[in-house]
Amino acid sequence: MGARVGNFGLAKSLHSHNSSDIHSSTSLVGPRGSVGYIAPEYGFGSKISTEGDVFSYGVIILEMLIGKRPTDEMFKDGLRLYKFVEKSFPQKIEEILDPRIVPGYRDEGEDAGGDLDWETHRMVAMNCIIKLTELGLLCSAVTPKDQPTIQHVYNEVTAIKESFPALQG
């Protein structure tokens, strides 16, 4: 999986001038975005909002954790990334995680980091993964009223970072 750069704000209409030339060349009919990442409410005519960005962020978190895109061929017949993760959360989450992020997957000779013994590191890392998964699920809920605010998302990500010593400094 390659690196991703997201700018969900580009889904907005680009025009803000009164010029008809600018309007005709930059006006978008509706929100644009990639299938699987764009908030479902945009398909029903909802206005662009931070809730849509929260949804997209949640999808990216889940994608990062399980190593599958929301457009993966396995997601068909009503199964989508959210449901796939939700079915396994939290008891069977390790079974669907991208093996490269599962604590215990490390190259030979790689240090666990810090002063923690390996088991403590594994426990702390899995706690971080569980919290990130929960946040990804909350953010990618189908309706905006079920999603956290962007401020809540920021606070949660900050708390997760602070709880995981390997991410410090």
Residue ranges, per PLM feature:
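Cytosolic eukaryotic protein kinase-like domains
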Residues: 1, 5-169
